[in-house]
Amino acid sequence: MRMRTPRLPVTRRQFARLLGGAGLACALPRIRAATTVGGPIVFQNTAPANGLDFVLHNDAAGRKYQVETVLGGLGVIDFDGDGWPDLYCVNGAALPSLEKSNPRFLNRLYRNNRDGTFTDVTQKAGVQGRGYDMGVAVGDYNNDGHEDLLILGVHGNTLYRNNGYGTFSDVTEAAGLNVQASGHKLWSVAAAWIDYDNDGYLDLIVSNYCDWTPGEDPVCGGLDPSERAYCHPDKYRAEPVQVFHNNGDGTFTEVSAKAGLGNLLGKGMGIAVADYDGDGLPDVFIANDNDRNMLIHNLGGGKMKEIGMQAGIAYNGDGRQISGMGADFRDFNGDGLPDILMTGLKNETFELFRNNGKGSFDDASANSGVLALSRPWNGWSCGLVDLDNDGLLDIFIACGGLDTNEPQPNRVLRNLGARFVDVSAGAGPDFAIPRVHRGVAFADFDNDGRIDAAVSSINGPVELWMNRTPMRHWLQLKLKGTHSNVSALGAKVICHGSESAQVAFVANSTGYACTSDLRVHFGLGEDRKVFLEIHWPSGIFQQIKDVACDQLLVIEESKSSSH
């Protein structure tokens, strides 16, 4: 285990230059709006022929247990450290027992064979799961260079420590992550690894949903079993947001109250992380299901404050709460400030909140075209990702109804600079296949510079949408912290091209109950060389000049700041 390293100071000039929220927006050249639409964004589903034979089972049998509707997390993890993204698939369990003894309910880990195929290594790795699982979070919590797995589930989470030789160990109890609330078991959906105090060790923020017990599940719809329906979230009590501090010795301590979030309750779903105000501290957005959304502002010194109402993200543009599901926290309009994407259910809205650089957000859903495009769809996991490598972040959304009788196709919205257009119809001959989709995790699974998408669907096969969009230039970065956490979560990268700049944070908690690739991806369009600025969580500032395009570059944190 790596020893703690003293923090190196960053100069006031460097801090102002890189971290000033409004200042950064002014200093960075804006990315130009696309004046012409390039070739189509095209995908090809290569599963299950490629070895990804996972099927998500919810054990629904007409009883309408609430947990049946909201599982489906996927996690991208390079568990063997070979530079090729592997895939972890979360699964359900038997109802009402929540037992996983039947092999069809096991979670699955698939190793990337580097040739377009995958191999199921679940049994050897020892990561089958323990119960009715929901989501997954990936991060190197003990800084040993091996990515670990946190599995979120109903009435119990599981921490798998990566042993570094193809196996994992269940260290949940030893790590102190079996903490529940007020004497009852929690239903966790998602979590984010986040070094909120920048001490070099990854802490945890856990998004819990509602108070649910199989034997006490209310009956909704008609009294006849054939008329039963899934209950509205209002039928259930909200649950607390949990914060766990990494003690640096392999254990965690719950510090929710100490951090200032002791009374923060919600019906938490998707969780996403970015430094929205440019103070060098990671902040957290949590989408809530028919409850106000949360923006957890990191105040420093181990303190946090929920400011969703003040920041303008608690409700949609009409002042209404919606069925918040998936979330992402990235810069869609190229002004250097991270914005928020949130999905909802049909006849609600997908929300796009634009960071105005003044500590709050404006609802950009209507002006961007996202509002009109979202009405017919039930959106779950999602992501702001550059699918055509033009330097603009597009939107990918996993869609599907609450019930298995309402399958829907996934959606792709192309970013034209000032607005989005739905290009799903041209995304490939099999892209329109409807299923009850839930999770989506993003990675360049074949390392060709184009971002691919793995998608889960309830009682259906996992889909692996390989990106076949016509090639443009690109750059991917794998950051390795030395003074900062090894995963480099929270680092900010500024990529300067010939006429524009892009800002990205190392953040892998995306969408709904999912984890995407830790690597930072930039679409470069026609640029062949770029200039990089990296601000590490430790405060170290690093510059790299004349970086060639079309490569995966591994960057280790420098010993001191460069000028």
Stretch-by-stretch model annotation:
Residues M1-Q14, G21-C26, A34:
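N-terminal secretory signal peptides
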Residues V10, A34-T69, L106, Y110-G131, ...:
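Blade-edge motifs of beta-propeller repeat domains
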Residues G39, A60, A372, L402-H563:
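Gly/Ser/Thr/Pro-enriched helix-cap/hinge segments flanking short amphipathic alpha-helices
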Residues L71-G81, D133-N143, S188-N198, L202, ...:
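Beta-propeller blade termini
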Residues L87-N91, D148-G153, L204-N208, V284-N288, ...:
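Hydrophobic beta-strand segments that make up the repeating blades of beta-propeller
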Residues N91-R104, C210-K235, A398-N405:
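Short, conserved, GDST-rich strand-edge loop motifs in beta-rich repeat architectures
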Residues E99-F105, H155, D234-E239, N290-D291, ...:
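Short, solvent-exposed loop/turn segments at conserved positions within beta-propeller repeat blades
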Residues A259-G391, I395-P409:
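Beta-propeller domains
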